[in-house]
């Protein structure tokens, strides 16, 4: 996929989910089909499976992450994260608000089988998040927000009784850029391209990256 192609393709699919073959060209269409990024609709049009997946492939092939991110909206990003978590057995709450000040996580995920929870914020729309200094500030705020959530957990049990089954929580920030990754202020910073791998191997990465583990004071062992 040529660099000029990737931006045009992202533009088309960010505007509508399905496009006519003539809008892409046969060579580009064939490549997208081979990469399993699109499928054929009822009338022969090509429909995108995931704009985020297309964005990740574009970045891997050399497209600028900052420019690529302009074709994504926060719903695309969070939907991809939520889908990956659901596939891994997590209960998912998007735009999870809590506390009198209405703090919010983009996604809160809990797995009652492993008794683990993950509080997630998605940072994809600004080049400033490629700065390690800025990301350090963001991670610190995220960690403090997670601590406040756990302090507030008793008030959340009425609406979310599953919290009783979660023993510990981790903080996670998902980015589109790969320039900053690892553990910052005890919070995992994971490029979206590696998100599925991180979730599937959570125990390994938590230990390897020294991600802070916060105990849930509302946990009740059954």
Go through the PLM ranges and name each one:
Residues 1-105, 109-222:
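Intrinsically disordered, low-complexity Ser/Thr/Pro/Gly-rich regulatory segments
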